[in-house]
Regions:
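C-terminal structural segments of small proteins and small subunits
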Residues: 51-79
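Generic preference for hydrophobic/aromatic residues in regular secondary structure cores
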Residues: 2-4, 42-47, 66
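Broad hydrophobic/π-residue packing in well-ordered secondary structure
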Residues: 12-16, 36, 71-78
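A short, structured beta-strand/loop element
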Residues: 15-53
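Short, charged/polar N-terminal "headpieces" of proteins
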Residues: 1-22
Length: 79
């Protein structure tokens, strides 16, 4: 598990042994898995457990703002 970003109380990680499609796991009070290239090349929530709806929305905005950098990190980690 590689922490690629810490921001606004969230820890965003990429698992080095994970699978495509490119996605991140967001940890806060719960966990969310977010696809980096969903419909229209926008982040897409795959699932969330134990997160408030407000935190899910906030994490989606954070991923959208940092999407390009996160895709670069995904490719660095997974080749």
């Amino acid at each position: 598990m590689i922490t690629v970003l810490r921001v606004e109380g969230f820890r965003i990680v990429i698992f080095s042994d994970d699978h495509e499609p490119a996605h991140v796991h967001v940890f806060g009070d719960g966990e969310a898995k977010i696809n980096l290239s969903g419909p229209n090349d926008r982040p897409e929530l795959i699932w969330a457990v134990g997160m408030k709806h407000a935190d899910i929305r906030k994490s989606m905005r954070l991923i959208e703002r940092n999407r390009e950098a996160l895709l670069v990190r995904w490719n660095e980690i997974h080749g």
